[in-house]
C-alpha cells in the first residue's frame, strides 16, 4: 500500500522520478514526509500498517485514500468508532491509464487529475453503519485507488483507522480466545469477581499484553477508544489529533472541513475562543472506571453499591502496538444490603441508638392503647441525623435533627410507626429517642436555641473566670464542671468531648464547680452568670454546663475553653 499523493506525483513527473522512495513504516521518515503540505493538500492518506486517529464533525464527511499497486494483494481495513456510531464505505477506483509514465505529450495539471480521480464513483466493496469495530478483509485485492468515506450523523466524534497489506504478519490487534466471554464468578453486596480466558497473543505469539477492566452503570463498551472518549469527555478541540502525527497539517488547519466551503458555511476559526469551546463542549459528569491490571485474568471489583446494576468490560492491549481488542462484556446486579434489624420502642422509655457513618437504623413503635397523638423526643448526641417517620407506610415526617427536638404527630387507632434514622457522611451518630402517647410526661429537659457558653474576657483574673449561659421558662437544674487542659488544646480534641449525651455522672467529683436551679418566664432575662474561682494563673480550662430534666436525663451545653491571666 502506498500513499495517494506519491501516486499522483507520478502523473506529473517524468519516468526517472519513479526512483523516489515511497513512504514506509519508518516512523521518522514518515513524519518527515507528512510535514510537506504540497504532498498532502486537501486530502488524507492512510499509511500501511499504522493506526491513525482522527476526528469527525457531525454531518461533515471525511475521505481517505490509499493505493494498492499490484493485483492479488492481501488487504485488511479496520475502522473503530469511539464515542458515536459511524457510517463508512470502502470503494475501489482504477488508476488513470497514463500512471505508468509511458505516454507522450503534455500531462494535465495535477489538481485537474486529482479531481478526475476523486469525482469518479468507483466500485463499492464494503459499507457499514453502527458503533462496532468492523473489518474489511480480502486475501486477494486488485490494484487500484481505494477510497474510504466516513460520516457521523449523531454528533462530533473521534475514530481510528488501520489498514495493512500484510495482515498475516502484522497482527497488531491482540487475539481473543475461542470463548471471549467475561464471566462473573462471585457476587456480593459491594464486590464482583470477574474471570476470562487468556489471550493467545501472550501464550502463543509471546507478545506482551495487559488487560484493562472497565466498570460503569450505563452500558457495555465495544472498544477501548470509546471508553477513553467517555473518560476524557472534554473540549473536543483539545482532544483532536495533532498535525504531523495523525493527519496532514492542512487537515489540522481546516479540521476536517472541505476546502471549498470551510470558511463560508461554518465560519470556523483555527483557534476557537475558550468561551465558545466551553459552551459547545461542557465537561459531563463521568461515572466510569478503568483499571489496567497487567496480565492477570481474574479480578475483583470492590467498593460497589448494593443492589445496583453494573456493566463490566475487559480489553486486552498489545503493549508494543498499544492497540486493543474487546472481550464480550457482561453485567451483574450486586446483592441487596442485609435487612436491618428493627428495634422495638416502648412507650415512655428512652432507647439509645448508634448509627454507623452513612448507615441507617430502623425502629418500630406500636402503642398498646388507642391514642390521639404520638410524641417523639430525639436527642442527637453528636452531629445531625436524619429522621423519617411513617405511619402504616405513609410518610409523616422527614427532616434533620440536631441537639434535642420533639415532634408531635396525629395518632390513629391500632397504628404502627416505623422510624428510620440515617447517619451523615462525617462520622458515626449517637442519639437517644423516646416515643410516647403521653406527651405531658417530659423526660428531656427543654433547651434554649443557643446552647453556647459565653466567657467575659474583661472579668478574667489570675484565679477566676466569669461565664454566662441561657436558660428557659422551665425550671431545670444546671451543673457546671471544669477541667484543666493543655494550652494547645485544639478543635479536634474539643469535638471528641462534644457528646451531649454523656452526663455529669462520668465526671470526677473534683471537676464539679456547683449545681443550681434556674428559670425565667421572660426569655429575654433567662440568662445566668457564674464565676469559677480557685483557678491557677496562666492555665487553660475546659468548662461544661449540664442541664438535668425532671426525668433525670441530662444534656450538655457546648464546651468552652477559658484561660486565666498570667500576670495580675
UniProtKB/Swiss-Prot annotation:
Secretory protein that plays a role in various cellular processes. Acts as a chemorepellent acting on gonadotropin-releasing hormone (GnRH) expressing neurons regulating their migration to the hypothalamus. Also promotes neuron migration, growth and survival as well as neurite outgrowth and is involved in the development of the olfactory system. May also act through the regulation of growth factors activity and downstream signaling. Also regulates extracellular matrix assembly and cell adhesiveness. It comes from Homo sapiens. It is found in: Secreted. Binds heparin and chondroitin sulfate. This is Protein NDNF. Expressed in neurons along the gonadotropin-releasing hormone (GnRH) expressing neurons migratory route. The gene is NDNF. It is linked to Hypogonadotropic hypogonadism 25 with anosmia: A form of hypogonadotropic hypogonadism, a group of disorders characterized by absent or incomplete sexual maturation by the age of 18 years, in conjunction with low levels of circulating gonadotropins and testosterone, and no other abnormalities of the hypothalamic-pituitary axis. In some cases, it is associated with non-reproductive phenotypes, such as anosmia, cleft palate, and sensorineural hearing loss. Anosmia or hyposmia is related to the absence or hypoplasia of the olfactory bulbs and tracts. Its main location: secreted.
